[in-house]
Amino acid sequence: MQRRPLIETVHGIRREAFGPQEWGLLASIAAMWGASFLFIEIGLEHFGPGLVAFGRVGIGAITLALLPRSHAPVDRADLPRIALLGFVWMAAPLLLFPIGQQWIDSSLAGMINGAVPVFAAVIAAILLRRRPGRRQLLGIAIGFVGVICVFWPATRGAEATVLGAGLVLLAVVFYGLAVNLAVPLQQRYGALPVLFRAQLVALVLLAPAALVSLPSSEFAWSSALAVMALGFFGTGWAFVAMTTLVGRVGATRGSVAIYFLPVVAIALGVVFRDETVASISLIGTGLVLAGAYLTSRRE
């Protein structure tokens, strides 16, 4: 039997324009992940970054464990790929976000997250050896300009702000790789078995970070409830919806769901945290929405 490479990706099964199911998945992803940045900020009020990351993955794994399909068998030959996903999709980015958000607002973190489709498209082109179509390239370019506008105010701030924004951007790079690697696995087994096992791997990897965070953490219901919501929605149901969307439309177009996160993140940050957003960041948000529309059209 021919051995599959450790790193592989494929196209989605749906090549035409988004339909009602795809847009519904996209909206739910944007709502759940857009709120995640607010939940992280609330969690950081009393918990260290490692504990926030470990807690959200733990709750997410418990959520998926309750679904029978999560326990469906997978080929042992694919376990190394799932373990790799546990690092690049779960452990690394989910730890980098709370570390970075110690120095930046939740709305800024959400807006930077809009860069995922840019990296997803570049990595997909490399792995698939296929360049995106003209419409997708235009959408990616417009979205990339929008992300630069969103990121620009952070470059004018203190060094800690730049560091925090940079760590969040690094997490986004991991996401760009992960959405590509997840496609063949989720098409082979479905979303739940892959996600559940990847989260179990991430729990092991994040355990040392959680232990390091314990001395600087104290229990508070506000932070505990935020982490619970973060795990149930942001690490449970949102990942299921995302892998379902990516499996249907491919990594490049599926990742456009990330374009809509800034809208939710900005609204929640302004309403609940009294955060301020620079005008250029709002312009950038409009650009990434335009890029999302173009990228989601027929290839």
What positions do the PLM features span?
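Glycine-/small-residue-enriched transmembrane alpha-helix faces in small-molecule transporters
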Residues: 2-54, 99, 157-184
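Hydrophobic transmembrane alpha-helices of multi-pass small-molecule transport proteins
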Residues: 7, 58, 64, 123, ...
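Juxtamembrane helix-entry segments on the extracytoplasmic side of multipass membrane proteins
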Residues: 18-23, 45-50, 54, 74-80, ...
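Specific transmembrane alpha-helical segments of multi-pass solute transporters/efflux pumps
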Residues: 31-40, 65-113, 149, 231-249
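Hydrophobic/small/kink-forming positions within alpha-helical transmembrane segments
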Residues: 34, 38, 65, 86-91, ...
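Specific alpha-helical transmembrane segments that line the substrate/conduction pathway
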Residues: 51-62, 89, 94-131, 135-136, ...
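Helix-helix packing/entry segments at the starts of transmembrane helices
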Residues: 54-55, 90, 109-115, 179-204, ...
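Transmembrane alpha-helical segments that form core, pore/gating elements
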Residues: 61-64, 120-122, 126, 140, ...
